[in-house]
Amino acid sequence: MTTGECCHLPGSLCDCTGNAALSKTVEEADNRRAQYVTQVTAKDGRLLSTVIKALGTQSDRPICRICHEGQDVCNSEGLLSPCDCTGTLGTVHKSCLEKWLSSSNTSYCELCHTEFTIERRPRPLTEWLRDPGPRNEKRTLFCDMVCFLFITPLAAISGWLCLRGAQDHLHFNSRLEAVGLIALTIALFTIYVLWTLVSFRYHCQLYSEWRRTNQKVRLLIPDTKGAHSTQHSLLSTKLLKKTADETIV
C-alpha cells in the first residue's frame, strides 16, 4: 500500500481543495488473509485517509445448511451433498441431517423433495421410561406406576381376606355373608383388572406414538454418491473462491 505525503490523520479536515477520488487496492497480509484497502486521496494525489478491512475467509468455504458451520476438523466430518440442492443449500453434515430427519420424522429433502436412503431404528423402552415426552404425560405415567405398585398388593390381600372370610361363613352355615364376600371379591378384582387394562392400553398408545416419532435415523450413502458429493463440494469451493476474487478485484 502506498502512502502520500499528507501529514493529516485519518478523519481530520484538510485544507486541500478539489474533489476527493476513491481508489481501491487489495493487499495480502502476513497471515495470508485478503485485506480490503480503501484510500481517499485529494485531487493532487495526496492521501487523506486509509480504511483497511480484513476479508473473512469463512464465506469462501461451503457450510452446512443446518448448523451453518464448515467442515468439522476435530471429528473429521466432511460436508455431503445427498440431494439435488445446489449452492449454499447443497452441503450438509451427515450427523446434522440425521438429527433433522429424526426430529421431523421425514425421509426426504424439504426443498427439492429428494428421497434419502435411510435406516430407522426404534429407541429402547428404557429411554421412553426416562423421558416419555411432555410434562403431563410424565406426571400421568408416574402416578399410574405408583398406583399400580400400591393397589396391586392391596387388591391381592383384600381378595384373600374376603375369600377367607367367605370360607369361614360357609363353615358356620352363614351363606348370605359368604355370598356377599364372594361378590365383593369379584367386584374388587373386576375394577382392578379394568383399571389396569385401560391404563396399560393408554400408555401403550403413547409409547407407540413416541417410538414412531423418535427413531434413530442412519443415512445410507452409496460410494458413487459419496464421490459425487466430494466433487460437488470441491466445485462449490472453487466457484465461491472465484466469485470472491472477482468481487475483490
From Swiss-Prot:
It catalyses: S-ubiquitinyl-[E2 ubiquitin-conjugating enzyme]-L-cysteine + [acceptor protein]-L-lysine = [E2 ubiquitin-conjugating enzyme]-L-cysteine + N(6)-ubiquitinyl-[acceptor protein]-L-lysine. The chain crosses the membrane at residues 141-161, 178-198. PROSITE patterns: ZF_RING_CH. It is found in: Endoplasmic reticulum membrane; Lysosome membrane; Endosome membrane; Golgi apparatus membrane. Pfam families: RINGv (PF12906). Zn(2+) 1 binds at C64, C67, H93, C96. GO terms for cellular component: cytoplasmic vesicle; endoplasmic reticulum; endoplasmic reticulum membrane; endosome membrane; Golgi membrane; lysosomal membrane; plasma membrane. One of its GO terms (molecular function) is ubiquitin protein ligase activity. It is an enzyme of class 2 (transferase). It is a multi-pass membrane protein. SMART domains: RINGv (SM00744). One of its GO terms (biological process) is endocytosis. Its EC number is 2.3.2.27. It comes from the Eukaryota. Pathway: Protein modification; protein ubiquitination. E3 ubiquitin-protein ligase which may be involved in endosomal trafficking. E3 ubiquitin ligases accept ubiquitin from an E2 ubiquitin-conjugating enzyme in the form of a thioester and then directly transfer the ubiquitin to targeted substrates. The RING-CH-type zinc finger domain is required for E3 ligase activity. This is E3 ubiquitin-protein ligase MARCHF2.
